[in-house]
Amino acid sequence: MEEEGVKEAGEKPRGAQMVDKAGWIKKSSGGLLGFWKDRYLLLCQAQLLVYENEDDQKCVETVELGSYEKCQDLRALLKRKHRFILLRSPGNKVSDIKFQAPTGEEKESWIKALNEGINRGKNKAFDEVKVDKSCALEHVTRDRVRGGQRRRPPTRVHLKEVASAASDGLLRLDLDVPDSGPPVFAPSNHVSEAQPRETPRPLMPPTKPFLAPETTSPGDRVETPVGERAPTPVSASSEVSPESQEDSETPAEEDSGSEQPPNSVLPDKLKVSWENPSPQEAPAAESAEPSQAPCSETSEAAPREGGKPPTPPPKILSEKLKASMGEMQASGPPAPGTVQVSVNGMDDSPEPAKPSQAEGTPGTPPKDATTSTALPPWDLPPQFHPRCSSLGDLLGEGPRHPLQPRERLYRAQLEVKVASEQTEKLLNKVLGSEPAPVSAETLLSQAVEQLRQATQVLQEMRDLGELSQEAPGLREKRKELVTLYRRSAP
């Protein structure tokens, strides 16, 4: 009678199977009496094949070891018999199988081999890989199924992939930008490099036409509000007068010995470069002009005191204002960026000179102005001078206009003034130290050349008819230049 767990098998080639253990063992037939028969056993992975003969190709029984729990030693009454048994696992309908080995060592080796076969039979379901196409992922890039469970924290590999993808995206975005680096700001020391750039000027009210110089009173000009005098470039410069007065306080202590010449009929644009000579030429310039100021001051004081209370600053500067207004009405308003900025620090406004002359009376000579704090700052660089222009020019830098003939004249006068000051300083150094005739001659020759060029420019401008009214004043200034040159000779 065959057992339920034993299967009849047909002919199988023995060499085609992997044999883990083989040998002759007595096997019990099972029943009450239990007959023991010699059988040739082959252990192949999780199967135990039973043959009647070693050379026989026909398998009598096939035992599936996955249906059994374990193999252990059988407690027999007579210990001299080496028997072991295969115990079935619960839930299976197979029966236990008993074996008897010839020796004890053979019994132990078979018990160990059969237990390994049982483990392989139980793990057979885990070793097999079954591919179910219905469970495939819908998206190629998803590495796991989107389940309802809570999402696990990202691993280091996942974070590295996210960082690399982000960096690739940033690099791809940078391809569209032509210059993604930080802007480089190169400081420019030269003023002319910033000239081509033009900024839009704010909208300003239209300028009012100038009145006749005789109908304009200095008292009205002083009392006008800021909004009315903003369009005129001459009067708008009074807004910058506190800055120019503060800038001129430091040079006032150094040049306290110098004296300012009196006011004349020449406009301020011509007086900028001739007004304040160096301390060495101040006495000669004063001797020719102090008689003019008292006459002009006393002649203006009489008609004004009857109408309004006396205001000393407008009285002193009335002729100066009239001449400058008449000159600007005849020639038109010049470019604010070139005319109002001067090398020696003086600008066209009348108010920077008011604190210096308000200390004295209208009849006092201009020598009282030596203690003034409004002396021009000689050594101040051009970019720090206060700008004299309208409110719109103060808010935004105006466009650069081509130089007019009067502006060229003004620049030529500035160059003559600067050259004369440099020559005077160098001559003072030469006279104070040991004589150096070679260097003195070189300096004098350069000064003569610059004076010759300036005189030629003035002559050309006068021939054009643009300076017909100021011809007497120019002659006097040219005489002063000749006097300066003669005094500076060693």
Swiss-Prot record:
Comp. bias regions, Acidic residues: 244-257
Protein name, per record: Pleckstrin homology domain-containing family O member 2
Pfam family of the protein (one): PH
Low complexity bias spans: 230-243, 277-297
PH domain span: 18-119
Coiled-coil region list: 439-481
Source organism (scientific name): Homo sapiens
List of residues that carry Phosphothreonine: 232, 298, 311
One of the record's GO cellular component terms: extracellular region
PANTHER family in the cross-refs: PH DOMAIN-CONTAINING PROTEIN, PLECKSTRIN HOMOLOGY DOMAIN-CONTAINING FAMILY O MEMBER 2
One example of a Gene Ontology biological process annotation: macrophage apoptotic process
Chain positions covered by the region annotation Disordered: 173-402
Residues bearing PTM Phosphoserine: 164, 167, 235, 237-238, 273, 390, 468
Gene: PLEKHO2
Entry keyword set: Coiled coil, Phosphoprotein
